[in-house]
């Protein structure tokens, strides 16, 4: 059981890293916030299309990551 949970945790971790890297950036970064791009940084921007799907997958994988981590902590 322990080996299965560790294997699942590694798979979820790698998938989470890949999905986060595939997401597009939402702002110009820190330089945009300092030089007057704050309206874009704090404005409401809804994800559409592929960004929405990647966002939802990220949330699901993050929840799985925490559940698996807590499960492994209690098994040890």
From Swiss-Prot:
<comment type="similarity">
    <text>Belongs to the SecG family.</text>
</comment>
<dbReference type="InterPro" id="IPR004692">
    <property type="entry name" value="SecG"/>
</dbReference>
<keyword id="KW-0813">Transport</keyword>
<keyword id="KW-0653">Protein transport</keyword>
<protein>
    <recommendedName>
        <fullName>Probable protein-export membrane protein SecG</fullName>
    </recommendedName>
</protein>
<dbReference type="GO" id="GO:0065002">
    <property type="term" value="P:intracellular protein transmembrane transport"/>
</dbReference>
<dbReference type="GO" id="GO:0015450">
    <property type="term" value="F:protein-transporting ATPase activity"/>
</dbReference>
<keyword id="KW-0472">Membrane</keyword>
<keyword id="KW-1003">Cell membrane</keyword>
<dbReference type="GO" id="GO:0009306">
    <property type="term" value="P:protein secretion"/>
</dbReference>
<feature type="transmembrane region" description="Helical">
    <location>
        <begin position="56"/>
        <end position="76"/>
    </location>
</feature>
<dbReference type="GO" id="GO:0043952">
    <property type="term" value="P:protein transport by the Sec complex"/>
</dbReference>
<comment type="function">
    <text>Involved in protein export. Participates in an early event of protein translocation.</text>
</comment>
<dbReference type="GO" id="GO:0005886">
    <property type="term" value="C:plasma membrane"/>
</dbReference>
<keyword id="KW-0811">Translocation</keyword>
<feature type="transmembrane region" description="Helical">
    <location>
        <begin position="2"/>
        <end position="22"/>
    </location>
</feature>
<keyword id="KW-0812">Transmembrane</keyword>
<keyword id="KW-1133">Transmembrane helix</keyword>
<dbReference type="Pfam" id="PF03840">
    <property type="entry name" value="SecG"/>
</dbReference>
């Amino acid at each position: 059981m322990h080996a299965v949970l560790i294997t699942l945790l590694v798979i979820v971790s790698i998938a989470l890293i890949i999905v986060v890297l595939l997401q597009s950036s939402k702002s110009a970064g820190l330089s945009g916030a300092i030089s007057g791009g704050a309206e874009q940084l704090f404005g409401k921007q809804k994800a559409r299309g592929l960004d929405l799907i990647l966002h939802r997958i990220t949330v699901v994988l993050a929840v799985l990551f925490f559940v698996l981590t807590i499960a492994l902590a209690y098994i040890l």
